[in-house]
């Protein structure tokens, strides 16, 4: 059954500044009407603070809102063998934590978001694909006895784009591996979200609804900062200017994407992931209200 939820990432600015606690953030997005919540550990660490892990479980039970996914940044590429082993051990700790919290899925990246743009070529991707595949297979094998499904999100500028993501998904031969389809992130590699969603929805276990303003490379809006997707304009791999927006106020046809998701047979969780420059609680609230309305309209 489809559940409409919110990623805590949308209000993580206030967590990182200490304006609200992680539990207060969870409570706020539950009060916005989320049927399920995604945890993203920006401003907190559940592996290092077991008491906070308990607090989240208690808050989830008290409010009647489950935690459906845990989203973890990771990087397994361009590392020494020692650093690769350390990263694998770190991610496995987070898989253990996900199991302890009875969260069914964990999103794990293969490449760093801030990886140099010159290293994001198709030639480099094809060179690194065997390592990406073996990494996810090891993570899936570790996660399976714990009942956890590992998710690949189209995130960043390397393991992104419908063709690259499809290649990874079809190469990893594990039944507890799937796709977290992020509508907005496809624009980071100049993939067309409305078309990418149609290509990739059959692989999706969860969906991120996210919107961006888009400006062509020759129309510099000013203030762009490389890799800063939260507080400014930034650029795609081919120079398109991108800026996060309130859902349905940007340039992605959210109605078209939502129709694709709704009538595809998808029956997982749809999370609002707000990444705009507005005050983050306001931006998350309006975006989630729009997401619910559009889901019912299409």
Write out the residue ranges for each language-model feature.
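C-terminal helical cap(s) of enzyme catalytic domains, especially alpha/beta-barrels
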Residues: 281-298
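Boundary/entry segment of secreted carbohydrate-active catalytic domains
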Residues: 1-21
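Catalytic domains of carbohydrate-active enzymes, especially glycoside hydrolases
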Residues: 21-42, 101-102
